[in-house]
Amino acid sequence: MENLEQKLAGDGRYVLEVRDDKMIDANIWDGNFVVADANKAAKSGDIVIALINNDEAVLRRFYKLDDRRVLLMCENKFFKPDIFSQNDIAIQGVVVGVFSYPK
């Protein structure tokens, strides 16, 4: 059996707990855990961890609009997408897995 801890974390991967409902249409729920890869370059359409203005880390779908702007989109119809200057965000990792623990 493979060591689950080694598979989930290490080599630039880390695990975060989801604390909102903004990605439910991507089947990522409040209380789930996401595995992010900090070494993977974000492509349009990827779900990412983005740091906004060096202040707030968010889980969003990423779209590069042009050389200066990106769109960060929730996967929940009740929230509008946000457009940012690339200077205002830093991609911290691309989501490569989602899991939950039974409660």
Language model segments and positions:
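A short, contiguous structural element within a folded domain that forms the immediate neighborhood
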Residues: 1-51
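Exposed loop/turn and edge beta-strand positions of beta-sandwich/beta-sheet ligand-binding modules
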Residues: 12, 56, 89
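Residues located in well-ordered beta-strands
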Residues: 17, 58-61, 94
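Short beta-strands and strand-coil junctions in structured, solvent-facing domains, enriched
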Residues: 24-25, 57, 102
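Well-ordered beta-strand positions in beta-sheet-rich domains
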Residues: 33, 59-61, 82-83
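Short acidic/polar capping segments at secondary-structure boundaries
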Residues: 40-41, 55, 77-78
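Short, compositionally biased
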Residues: 44-70
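Glycine- and charge-enriched low-complexity intrinsically disordered segments
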Residues: 64-103
